[in-house]
């Protein structure tokens, strides 16, 4: 029964004392988790090796304080401990650069959503769509005060309006700010990008499963920095078109 529940319930929100990633909903986030796990495996091996070497040196040194008193240099060992770490860094850097390039690449998006950070709320614009009055669809998103939260809503995470996106659709987020530097971050989507005044940054996402994903402004932006949550609702294409018609 527990295995069935674990396969259905996804970890898409921050949890108290959480130390690992939220469940991935995009290929970018899957790549980040895979890269982290692979690198962490080798880092643990290196940590164990270095710890064993230090322990051996301290242990042998306590028995004989001057085991090699006539040894003044060791070119071989110096070459080894210079080249080996450099190779390790190259092995780590190469897949990191590939993933970084793929996360930044935006190719033929099906739709674009603009996110503008302000003190202390977000403004969203669907520039590819217009309403009945001929204007682009845009709205502001504010955090719900704790005294107005309903059952099941999360403090400092739920908002009065949310970004609605269709699943299995290439989406481009264009991020900027109107006052100070903010940061648009949604962990489950593998998105974290600065919102800078006078500058347009972009990032893409391909959401692969329906759900509600939460994020926050991740750049200290003032006294109400913690009151800038981000809520993304991923729905089917049919539900997304229905939502568009209601705007």
From Swiss-Prot:
Cu cation A1 binds at residues 182, 217, 221, 228. The gene is COX2. Binds a dinuclear copper A center per subunit. It catalyses: 4 Fe(II)-[cytochrome c] + O2 + 8 H(+)(in) = 4 Fe(III)-[cytochrome c] + 2 H2O + 4 H(+)(out). The signal sequence of COX2 is processed by IMP1. Belongs to the cytochrome c oxidase subunit 2 family. The chain crosses the membrane at residues 39-59, 79-101. This is Cytochrome c oxidase subunit 2. Component of the cytochrome c oxidase, the last enzyme in the mitochondrial electron transport chain which drives oxidative phosphorylation. The respiratory chain contains 3 multisubunit complexes succinate dehydrogenase (complex II, CII), ubiquinol-cytochrome c oxidoreductase (cytochrome b-c1 complex, complex III, CIII) and cytochrome c oxidase (complex IV, CIV), that cooperate to transfer electrons derived from NADH and succinate to molecular oxygen, creating an electrochemical gradient over the inner membrane that drives transmembrane transport and the ATP synthase. It is an enzyme of class 7 (translocase). It is a multi-pass membrane protein. The lineage of its organism: Eukaryota, Fungi, Dikarya, Ascomycota, Saccharomycotina.
């Amino acid at each position: 029964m527990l295995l069935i529940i674990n396969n259905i319930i996804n970890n898409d929100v921050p949890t108290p004392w959480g130390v690992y990633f939220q469940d991935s909903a995009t290929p970018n986030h899957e790549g980040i988790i895979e890269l982290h796990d692979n690198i962490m495996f080798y880092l643990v091996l290196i940590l164990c090796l270095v710890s064993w070497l230090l322990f051996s040196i301290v242990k042998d040194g306590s028995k004989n304080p001057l085991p090699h008193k006539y040894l003044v240099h060791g070119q071989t060992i110096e070459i080894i401990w210079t080249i080996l770490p450099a190779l390790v860094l190259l092995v780590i850097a190469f897949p990191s650069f590939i993933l970084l390039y793929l996360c930044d690449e935006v190719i033929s998006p099906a739709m674009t959503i603009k996110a503008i950070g302000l003190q202390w709320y977000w403004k969203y614009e669907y520039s590819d769509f217009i309403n009945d009055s001929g204007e682009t669809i845009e709205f502001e998103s504010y955090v719900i005060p704790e005294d107005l939260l309903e059952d099941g809503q999360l403090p400092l995470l739920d908002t009065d309006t949310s970004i609605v996106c269709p699943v299995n659709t290439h989406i481009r987020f264009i991020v900027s700010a109107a006052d100070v530097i903010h940061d648009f971050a949604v962990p489950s989507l593998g998105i974290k990008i600065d919102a800078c005044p006078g500058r347009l940054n972009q990032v893409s996402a391909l959401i692969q499963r329906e759900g509600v994903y939460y994020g926050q402004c991740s750049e200290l932006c003032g006294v109400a920095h913690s009151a800038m949550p981000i809520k993304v609702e991923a729905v089917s294409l049919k539900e997304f078109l229905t939502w568009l018609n209601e705007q």
